[in-house]
């Protein structure tokens, strides 16, 4: 993060470079077979690189103020790398999986033909029955933006903003194994059981923003905003074989989904006092091509451009100092999220609630500032409420995330200007309640019935030092 004062304006250059690596070996039971089938799953050295560059030029305060900038984001998966492996523990279990998961006889399949990349030194060889491999997967987003503020007087400010963006991506990936015996790769010359997908795409658009801000007095501000935003589209993993007979998935799944467009209108109030502050915002969002996360009966999740939708509601945050040591804060939102059109392939009618949207959530915090062994310290207790959401437009409680409430506790000490010690307890009362329920009959040969609980009480001790 580099800042420089050029005199007439300020410049800020922000560069971020991250590498993320994920390795794991998991003992699991495939959901399309009996629970007792041993079928290890390997995430083998998944590595991705993310690079962000942003340059902002910012004017000095005055009657007319401006900010212009450049933003670039790049994502790359490790090229020519194995992403995932599933294998049986011996030949007998491999033949069991072949028969019941893919309808294959022992002589129909030979895992040794997929070398490379799955050779003798690979864990699970030669009892491999599914794997994925990335030749390349690249994404890039570039945008230029500007915001221009005109201070009409000490109370009134008018704002105009613009953002021009372009998104490009390209990928080539392979899947191998018993589920793809009718495929022979991109060029048709690979061994049977090689599924290849080569994808690329790009899109660009320009979005605008308009705003007005009026300071009634030092303690009260009113504002209104109208802006067009977007959530980036991209490519997604192919449907797994057990979704091949799912009618809903086959009707609307696509390896590529586009960016959506959100036309947002907001009206807000900011109030301040000697011992309090409050912000209240009403928002209304008209979506076009909204990205909906779909969970069909086969249990897979994917993104789908669901046409037009509308979300509207309120956001509130409030702080109140009871005295010099004790303060309260509240933040919450309540909204409705509905499709504006019929989506026959998903069984949705205009006015139905959008899947996987939490319409109500809030947090209430109590803070006590004190000293412990002469160190400035604080204790904080939070009550968190998470509203329910449903996987489908049908709002089936057997495919949903029920609402729940939990308590969190934090105790922090400022050991010096640079070092801090913090004790955190998540789910203080060790509440045991459902976080996710999935119990539906699907198009595979057996129903899927399982449940996730919210994480149990978790205690974390963290020491941080700032240089």
Language model segments and positions:
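Outer-membrane beta-barrel domain signature, strongest for Gram-negative TonB-dependent receptors
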Residues: 1-67, 74-78, 266, 277-279
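Residues on the lipid-exposed face of transmembrane beta-strands in outer-membrane beta-barrel proteins
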Residues: 2-4, 55-60, 68, 144-150, ...
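Membrane-embedded beta-barrel scaffold of Gram-negative outer-membrane proteins
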Residues: 3-5, 10-16, 20-28, 215, ...
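Outer-membrane beta-barrel strand-turn architecture
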Residues: 5-8, 51, 59-63, 150-154, ...
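Solvent-exposed loop segments that connect transmembrane elements
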Residues: 27-42, 82-134, 170-202, 234-256, ...
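Structural signature of Gram-negative outer-membrane beta-barrels, strongest in the C-terminal barrel
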Residues: 57-59, 69-73, 135-285, 367, ...
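Gram-negative outer-membrane beta-barrel transporters
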Residues: 63-67, 153-158, 275-277, 282-286, ...
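C-terminal beta-signal and adjacent terminal beta-strands/loops
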Residues: 384-392, 413-467
């Amino acid at each position: 993060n580099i800042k420089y004062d050029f005199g007439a304006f300020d410049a800020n250059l922000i560069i971020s470079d991250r590498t993320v690596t994920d390795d794991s070996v998991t003992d699991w039971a495939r959901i399309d077979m009996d629970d007792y089938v041993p079928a290890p799953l390997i995430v083998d050295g998944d590595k991705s690189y993310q690079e962000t560059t942003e340059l902002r030029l910012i004017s000095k305060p005055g009657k007319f103020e401006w900010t212009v900038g450049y933003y670039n984001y790049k994502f790359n998966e490790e090229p020519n790398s194995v992403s995932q492996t599933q294998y049986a523990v011996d030949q007998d279990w491999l033949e069991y999986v072949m028969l019941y998961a893919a309808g294959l006889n022992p002589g129909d399949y030979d895992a040794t033909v997929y070398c490379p990349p799955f050779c003798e030194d690979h864990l699970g060889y030669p009892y491999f029955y599914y794997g994925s491999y990335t030749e390349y997967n690249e994404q890039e987003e570039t945008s230029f933006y500007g915001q221009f503020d005109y201070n009409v007087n000490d109370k009134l400010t008018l704002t105009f903003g613009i953002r021009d963006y372009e998104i490009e991506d390209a990928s080539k990936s392979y899947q191998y194994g018993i589920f793809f015996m009718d495929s022979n790769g991109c060029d048709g010359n690979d061994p049977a059981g090689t599924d290849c997908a080569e994808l690329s795409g790009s899109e660009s658009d320009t979005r605008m923003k308009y705003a007005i801000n009026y300071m009634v007095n030092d303690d009260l501000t009113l504002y209104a905003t109208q802006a067009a935003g977007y959530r980036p589209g991209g490519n997604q993993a192919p449907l797994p074989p057990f979704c091949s007979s799912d009618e809903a998935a086959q009707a609307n799944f696509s390896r590529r989904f586009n960016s959506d467009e959100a036309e947002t209108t907001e009206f807000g109030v900011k109030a301040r006092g000697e011992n309090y502050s409050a912000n209240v915002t009403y928002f209304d969002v008209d979506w076009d091509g909204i990205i909906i996360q779909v969970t069909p009966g086969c249990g897979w999740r994917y993104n789908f451009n669901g046409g037009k939708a509308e979300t509207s509601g309120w956001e509130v945050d409030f702080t109140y100092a009871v005295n010099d040591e004790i303060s309260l804060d509240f933040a919450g939102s309540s909204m409705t999220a509905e499709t504006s059109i019929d989506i026959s392939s998903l069984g949705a009618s205009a006015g139905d609630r959008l899947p996987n949207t939490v319409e109500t959530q809030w947090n209430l915090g109590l803070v006590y500032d004190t000293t412990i062994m002469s160190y400035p310290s604080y204790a904080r207790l939070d009550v968190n409420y998470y509203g329910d959401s449903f996987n489908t437009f049908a709002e089936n409680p057997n495919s949903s995330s029920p609402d729940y409430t939990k308590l969190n506790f934090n105790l922090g000490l400022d050991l010096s200007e640079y070092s801090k010690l913090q004790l955190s307890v998540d789910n203080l009362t060790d509440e045991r309640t459902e976080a996710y329920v999935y119990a539906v009959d699907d198009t595979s040969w057996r129903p899927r019935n399982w449940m996730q609980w919210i994480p149990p009480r978790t205690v974390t001790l963290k020491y941080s030092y700032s240089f």
